[in-house]
Amino acid sequence: MKKKNIQTPVLSMAIAACMISHQQNARAGEKPSLQNDSVPYVTMPDVSPKLTTGDGNPLLDFMFTADPTAVEYNGRIYVYATNDQQQYDSIGGYGKNSYEYIKSLVMMSSDDMTNWTYHGIIKTDSIAPWIQTSWAPSIAKREEADGKTHFYLYFSNSGGGTAVLTSTSPIGPWSSPLNHSLVDTNTPGIAGECKAAFDPGVVIDDKGKGWLTVGGGCARIMRLGKDMISVDGPIKPIRAPHHFEANELNYINGTYVYTYNIDWQDFSDWPLQTEKPTTCCMSYMTSKTPLVTKSWKYQHNYMKNPGDYGFDYSNNHTHLHKFRGKWYVFYHTMSLQHSFNTTAGFRNVCVDEIQVDENTVNIHMGNQTLKGVKQIQPMNPFIIQQAETTAATQGVKFTNGKSIGDMYAVTVPNKTGIIAVRGVEFNKVPSSLEIKASGNGIIEVRRDTPDGEVIASIKVGTPQMKLIESQLQKNMTGTMDLCFVLKGNNITFDEWKFK
């Protein structure tokens, strides 16, 4: 039987209430919090759970992430997540993931749902020094009078409040328009009954109005001001049965859809005629008039706990998103931590398809898998592709490039680095490969697997980042996977393109 990693509502609220003392301990030197944008090498899996299996989950196999949200922009889906890796880097695999050292958010994106580009982290504590921690983001975008698309990224400022960052790009730079939380546990309409004002969920409806939900152990909804960084009018309750956390909002066919995490109780007091939900599952409610409390109708649960799908039992958090005509559910499990030889509660973001009937606003029961979703378009090898775009990795970490959201792949000492990409379509025969890299060693390109047929072998011998071109050892066409195998010392890999 799987060991359950269960936090009761009382324990969850206690953790939130203790965040201030945790932060004071950290500042006093009990545990340093890493503040750079790279993924430091602490312990990495000897074998990636994705490299040889063909699995698509988790989205990133080299770091821990959780509590996903997403937004579409220019044909790509951008996913934002809690940076569990920062907690892991601060305490190691033998501590407990109690989230107190997490002061950043993770960014990644994809145009094919298989190869994911890691854009680095948002250092929330540098942008907004007044925050305590940053968890569970939710994002919305809109085009404004200046002709630019503006992004509004809300996140939990510990358990006590919800903060917001803004940008005119999905990868930043980000700024804090306020010097305090947008709402907290002292805000009228939240104060008193709600012990936590966190886990925000945001949506913009078809009239251009923004809406925000928050809460832990209770749920609150508010209309946002025209500036998206203020509250317009009263904050109203949503009477969500057995509410725990993980609020999100969608707007489907003129209906407001509120999703949340059901608690760990036995439901002997379940107040509705509907089927009782499963423990710590995800459920949803609907309304046409969101500020009218009685208008909210509970529907049913649409995703069980990860433990009910064969993973470890854990807290639960999802985001529903329609992309390229398909509905997806983003969620987290704790499957990756076993590759890191830890059971301390570190999470990883995954995605699977889910069926949503938009006419009836019915969300069918979803599934959680290691396999994940199908690739929705092939990768084009004849345009510049970034080394931080991966389907699977092993023995590499990522550090900042020269521009915001640009990363370099760097080999880990005493390990062969591997970067795999999938579904690469050669619709013509290439003659050469150009890479940008530095260091000393060899970058091999192999077909399908890390020990597959060698397509190209490029010698790297330069301390400065440099374009290097090489003829191919093998002619090929068709669709295939590629593995970039990095052998040598201090290889830094930026980009590649076939010609």
Q: Locations of the language-model features?
A:
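Bacterial Sec-dependent N-terminal signal peptides
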Residues: 1-30
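Carbohydrate-active catalytic/glycan-binding domains of CAZyme proteins
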Residues: 29-457, 461-499
